[in-house]
Amino acid sequence: MATGKIIQVIGAVVDVEFPQDTVPKVYDALEVQNGEAKLVLEVQQQLGGGVVRCIAMGTSDGLSRGLSVTDLGHPIEVPVGKATLGRIMNVLGEPIDMKGDIGEEERWAIHRPAPSYEELSNSQELLETGIKVMDLICPFAKGGKVGLFGGAGVGKTVNMMELIRNIAIEHSGYSVFAGVGERTREGNDFYHEMTDSNVLDKVSLVYGQMNEPPGNRLRVALTGLTMAEKFRDEGRDVLLFVDNIYRYTLAGTEVSALLGRMPSAVGYQPTLAEEMGVLQERITSTKTGSITSVQAVYVPADDLTDPSPATTFAHLDATVVLSRQIASLGIYPAVDPLDSTSRQLDPLVVGQEHYNVARGVQSILQRYQELKDIIAILGMDELSEDDKLVVARARKIQRFLSQPFFVAEVFTGSPGKFVSLKDTIRGFKGILDGDYDHLPEQAFYMVGTIEEAVEKAKKL
């Protein structure tokens, strides 16, 4: 193993000089003894003259020039397989849950090639989430990629926790959760939520949270993905949850600036599209097994045209857009049914009835949107009888798209509901056909199936 010495430290960036004939390769891991602890560095650039520029996978406090650095001769490797289930790990795959060592069956490098073209498989099977608005408007494909887009505080993490709870319990497969640059409190909540739902033994948790250096936040998504790839290559259907993919981009921006690259649009790294592509192309399903991924995407200043969310859009099969306007009406989940899309919403995949009901719901909501201006200026009385009916049904649909969540029982005080796709389609079809025109709109708010709305109406 070659050894070199530190010649410069600038924040998270460390330059190391090696003898000319033993310069480490890009992405190789180096190790330096920093006081009591060992610090891992990852090579990012070869500067010439035997000098490599590295990013620290931990705090660089206490490093000094002249310290000896060892080249490990391979990229960062993390434990994979069943030993990781029920454990919380950091970017290097080290346990941070105080439960002792992870019995390692095997270690894989976090930098791996994406599956080749002939290995890929395309599935048309639907994944039922039990959340009405998602199952109806933007159905998820098994082995597909879903993005949850939303600004600050509209419910991305709560939606994701509900999805994990519903899918992990109903789907009974393995899941991997990568917390990328999110709040440590959310990671803690998530751990306890999984413990309470008795699904912790089926989930691997990998955290690189907000307080960690950019190197950790940039690579932790790859650590989680590597663990998911191992389960997939064993022939399983695995779920990969990433919260939040925007922080992955942001960590890349920080690293890029520290490495001295010229920024591109809005200050993002010039390699934004390539970095996103390298990650997203590995999240895919092969003929052996599948990875279904759900990714939360923070939208800066609620602007979907920002380069980071815009780059993410291109890789997804379904997009769930959370809207501040809908959240302000008190309708949760605050999914915008007119802005959310799915490649699966096709009569050949979901069937003619589902397709017709979903499009019917969207067209009524769209018409209501157009009539809002007239109502604001002239009032409801100026509308034709047909339009009044459209408005009444649209408001019922809007309320029926809300649903009490299991993970939000503490906030709502009402028990969570899992609604099957069959019940969802039946309920919305009934509203569109006018079967429930006699019920008050309040009866449709925060209920599961249509029968519950009918029951609630009797009490109002």
Swiss-Prot record:
| Topology of the protein relative to the lipid bilayer | Peripheral membrane protein
Reply yes or no: does the keyword Ligase apply: no
Its Gene Ontology cellular component terms are:
plasma membrane; proton-transporting ATP synthase complex
SMART domains recorded for this chain? AAA
Principal EC category: translocase
UniProt-listed Enzyme Commission number(s): 7.1.2.2
Query: Which GO molecular function annotations are given, in alphabetical order?
Result: ATP binding; ATP hydrolysis activity; proton-transporting ATP synthase activity, rotational mechanism
Q: Which reaction does it catalyse?
A: ATP + H2O + 4 H(+)(in) = ADP + phosphate + 5 H(+)(out)
Which residues are recorded as binding ATP? G150, G151, A152, G153, V154, G155, K156, T157
Keywords per UniProt: ATP synthesis, ATP-binding, Cell inner membrane, Cell membrane, CF(1), Hydrogen ion transport, Ion transport, Membrane, Nucleotide-binding, Translocase, Transport
Q: Which Gene3D superfamilies has this protein been placed in?
A: 2.40.10.170, Bovine Mitochondrial F1-atpase, Atp Synthase Beta Chain, Chain D, domain 3 (1.10.1140.10), P-loop containing nucleotide triphosphate hydrolases (3.40.50.300)
Classify the main location: membrane
Q: Which Pfam families does the entry mention?
A: ATP-synt_ab, ATP-synt_ab_N, ATP-synt_VA_C
Looking up SUPFAM superfamilies in the UniProt record yields:
C-terminal domain of alpha and beta subunits of F1 ATP synthase, N-terminal domain of alpha and beta subunits of F1 ATP synthase, P-loop containing nucleoside triphosphate hydrolases
Sorted alphabetically, which CDD domains does this protein's record hold?
ATP-synt_F1_beta_C, ATP-synt_F1_beta_N, F1-ATPase_beta_CD
**Localisation per UniProt entry:** Cell inner membrane
Q: How does it assemble?
A: F-type ATPases have 2 components, CF(1) - the catalytic core - and CF(0) - the membrane proton channel. CF(1) has five subunits: alpha(3), beta(3), gamma(1), delta(1), epsilon(1). CF(0) has three main subunits: a(1), b(2) and c(9-12). The alpha and beta chains form an alternating ring which encloses part of the gamma chain. CF(1) is attached to CF(0) by a central stalk formed by the gamma and epsilon chains, while a peripheral stalk is formed by the delta and b chains.
Function, as annotated: Produces ATP from ADP in the presence of a proton gradient across the membrane. The catalytic sites are hosted primarily by the beta subunits.
PANTHER family recorded: ATP SYNTHASE (PTHR15184), ATP SYNTHASE SUBUNIT BETA, MITOCHONDRIAL (PTHR15184:SF71)
What family is this protein classified in? Answer: Belongs to the ATPase alpha/beta chains family.
Report the protein name in the record. Answer: ATP synthase subunit beta
What lineage does UniProt assign to this protein's organism?
Bacteria, Pseudomonadati, Pseudomonadota, Gammaproteobacteria, Enterobacterales
